[in-house]
Amino acid sequence: MLGWNKHVFFSESRINFRCLLRKKLKKRCPLSARFVLVLLLIVLIFILKMGYKQLIYKLNHPPLRRIDERNDPLFSNGCKNVHLEAQLHPRMNATFVMLARNSDLPGVVSSINSLEKHFNRHFNYPYTFLNDEPFDEKFKETILKLTSANVEFGTLEKDTFGFPGNVDVDAAREAIASQGDRGIMYGDTESYHHMCRFFSGFFYKHPLLLKYQWYWRVEPDVAFTCDISYDPFYYMEENGKIYGYVVALKELEDTVPNLFRYTSAYRRNNNLTSNMWKFFLDAPKKENYDISRKDPTVGLSFSSHLNAMIDSSYSAETSSMEGESYNMCHFWSNFEIANFKFFRNEQYENFFRTMDATGGFWTERWGDAPFHSLAAGLFLSKEQVHYFRDLGYRHSDIHHCGQSLGCNCECIPELSEIESTSGGCVTQWVNLIGDGFLDE
């Protein structure tokens, strides 16, 4: 008869048989072995879960498009032998640089753990931490436990992180407050203006950094999502690169309404030519402008003319200059690897002093990222700039993942690939360095 017969199941002979079977299984499978089996099962589930996440990422994110890399080839496609790389090539004169406060410690720990895991445990480059206030002992002790690399902690001088002596502070603060009223991102945060000015014209002169030739900028609360199995400093040196980036995107237009006009005027007045400049150009517009003329939006002694500055910031003409219009593209400077010689020269210093004198770091919300980028357009060739397309990086909700180009990439399924968004600038880059996308 089909079905379950409780009398048969609970018969004495069946019960004795099951008891005997359990005894034999216990002898054959002791407690330690069962623990190992459970552990292996947990590991298998974890591996399957991670594989599932990457499968979901690939289904929701198309692979990176093939590009013409003749002028900027990858330093690595896939994984190199990281142990061999670390032994073969000499360490460059380089350091990581992070500007942070004591309150940033959790985000700093997260960033350093990610960087050590994916790169620096093999290459052991030193860290330089900077702060506008002294670091406390808790901060320093925590950081020293995260890495075997050398670590230095420095404090910024007041004249490099604050209002300079020739600035009308009340007018500057009024201009900063007005940016908050207009909803400009970080526009009403005074320390943000100080930070952008510091990274535009002073960080490379800090006493702790003067001994270095190269730097890699790191910020709190970022993540590296691919293993970096080679030394970026070494390969940049070997390939004649000066500046490297991993994210290129468009700036918020209301943060830099006059930066491009002033930079373009500086370029023309100093007869500067570079094939890098085209990266920043949009459709042409005709406008005549003299950077030396008196302008109510220039300088900081014009408190009574604040309304004129506000109107100018929203003018459709402010991003144009003699037929050249700024496309808002820039390299995100929270991840940049560069040679200090890009900054440590009279050419760059003169450019910074000229731009600083306009007051744009206060009357507008100039970021160091577009400032560095436009300076690269003035002083570097496209052959001296490198796109680390094989690396993976996440800052806030902006994400680039090397996918099949990188090494052991763990892309973040919840975030869009910056190359695939309208705010990215990969199209401008590939058109600059070659013949565009190869799948067109």
From Swiss-Prot:
It is an enzyme of class 2 (transferase). The active site is at residue 336. One of its GO terms (biological process) is cell wall mannoprotein biosynthetic process. The keyword Iron does not apply. InterPro entries: Glyco_trans_15, Nucleotide-diphossugar_trans. PANTHER family: ALPHA-1,2 MANNOSYLTRANSFERASE KTR1, O-GLYCOSIDE ALPHA-1,2-MANNOSYLTRANSFERASE HOMOLOG 4. Belongs to the glycosyltransferase 15 family. This is O-glycoside alpha-1,2-mannosyltransferase homolog 4. It is a single-pass type II membrane protein. The gene is omh4. Pfam families: Glyco_transf_15. Residues 57-440 are lumenal. Its main location: cytoplasm. It is found in: Cytoplasm; Nucleus; Golgi apparatus membrane. Its EC number is 2.4.1.-. Probable mannosyltransferase involved in O-glycosylation of cell wall and secreted proteins. Transfers an alpha-D-mannosyl residue from GDP-mannose into lipid-linked oligosaccharide, forming an alpha-(1->2)-D-mannosyl-D-mannose linkage. One of its GO terms (molecular function) is alpha-1,2-mannosyltransferase activity. The chain crosses the membrane at residues 36-56. Keywords: Cytoplasm, Glycosyltransferase, Golgi apparatus, Membrane, Nucleus, Signal-anchor, Transferase, Transmembrane, Transmembrane helix. Residues 1-35 are cytoplasmic. GO terms for cellular component: Golgi apparatus; Golgi membrane; nucleus.
